[in-house]
Amino acid sequence: VNLIGEHTDYNGGRVFPCALTIGTYGVARRREDKKLRFYSMNFEQLGVIESSVEGLKPEKEADWTNYPKGVMWAFCEKGMEVTNGMDLLLFGNIPNGSGLSSSASVEVLTGYILRDQYGFEVSNQDLALIGQFSENKFNGVNCGIMDQFAIAMGKKDHAIFLDTATMEFEYAPIQLEGAKLVISCSNKKRGLGDSKYNERRSECEAALAELQQVIGIESLGDLSEEQFETYKSAIKDPVRVKRARHAVYENQRTIKA
């Protein structure tokens, strides 16, 4: 869960997430053939879903299995060949569609499994980047790095102050004397793929391109509040002004927090 820093991770800003005590658990067996067999205890009605490591591509009817398949595809794209099939059983206690990164959890878990099965030399940070790459390129969701990073790099009783532009980070102890963090579920299902997420990112990227015509920046996260107010007239659409303003001001709020 992110404590502060919303819509900043894909704008080169800072985020302040922490990992949760709930997650996704899996049992995997490497096969001698090319067959993939997936089963989720959370979606028992779907039964065993079969695929192959050969010619991996997203399939709408496959639903959740696109996440582990995407990570397998991403490993291959990064030069780490997944040569054998797999039987994969998953169980998760993250409320599905609640905005608590269940898909990123599946991605990172799949990365852990592949690293273990094949002996790939990849760090936890690399696994986070591979998970993001798979979600961007295989599943078509232009997410930032925050969810996968928090899951792969989370530390007990700590949050992570992460600069998404440089990937520099530090752990910040969370010791709340006499207080608790409460996460509530509204029961409104949420998925990045069918939300306005990609649209928001496109709007921010368009605003950045307009600002880059008048000031030398790499991302919206490079701007101070004062700089934004000085140069915001370069953004031609009022909606894009709102999107960019949020990214800039939220980034500064995160730094102060």
Where do the language-model regions lie?
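ATP-binding N-lobe of GHMP and related small-molecule kinases
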Residues: V1-L100, A104, V108-N124, L129-F133, ...
